[in-house]
Amino acid sequence: MVKAQNAVSIATDLSVLRSLSEGQRFTAIGQTVQAQYHFTPKEAGYAWVSYYSPGKYKNTLTATAKDPLTTPAAMNYMASSELRFRQISLGWKHYFKGAYDSEDPFNIYGTAGFGLLFSKVQNTHSQAIDTAVYIKPMQSVAGSDDFRRLTFDLALGTELKLGAGIYFYTELRTWLPASSNPAPHLFDKYTPQVAMLNGGIRILFD
């Protein structure tokens, strides 16, 4: 008897991302492209690439005078920021209900993995502050920066069978920071803190 080969799926989706980080709340639109290798009917490994449109947000910051006799003693200014995410992730997929090739109309699954987040942030300040006279906050430094962070990636999803080997899926995802690398251009050092709603198509090659 010849043993059947394990199956492969290719999937793509549209994603709405909401950043929940303090001082960095924004919404962005993105896409994920992924491959899945099905080891058993309920277990699979995945690899995905995702990218998002820039998210924009603003914060009012205060620079304080070094000398208490300076007038004014403090100056407020606006930091306008743009933050963009790209990510690759490797992980595991488990079906709680159904299977990758289930004939049932409805599947439920979860995923867990580790990712590498590539981010670019750019900050513009509403006015120039003389740093010889005033002390500026450490966060949201003017200029741009690229940074990387490890993430712990979780998702809960459902699938609806549309036809032979074609499934429509929806997922709730999140990325949690798995490494600490303070970036002075960010307002929140615990970036990313995000929630995503994804919807797309998975095609099975059996």
Task: Locate each region found by the language model.
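Cleavable N-terminal export/targeting peptides
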Residues: 1-7, 206
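Residues that define the transmembrane beta-barrel architecture of outer-membrane proteins
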Residues: 8, 27-31, 82-88, 106, ...
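Flexible, solvent-exposed coil segments and beta strand-coil junctions
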Residues: 9-16, 65-74, 130-138, 176-182
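Residues on the lipid-exposed face of transmembrane beta-strands in outer-membrane beta-barrel proteins
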Residues: 12, 16, 33-37, 90-94, ...
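Sequence/structural signature of outer-membrane beta-barrel proteins
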Residues: 15-21, 54-56, 97-99, 117-121, ...
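Extracellular loop and loop/strand-boundary signature of outer-membrane beta-barrel proteins
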Residues: 17-21, 73-80, 97, 138-144, ...
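Gram-negative (and chloroplast) outer-membrane scaffold detector with strong preference
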Residues: 37-131, 198-206
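Predominantly the C-terminal beta-signal and adjacent terminal strand-loop region
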Residues: 55-60, 76, 154-206
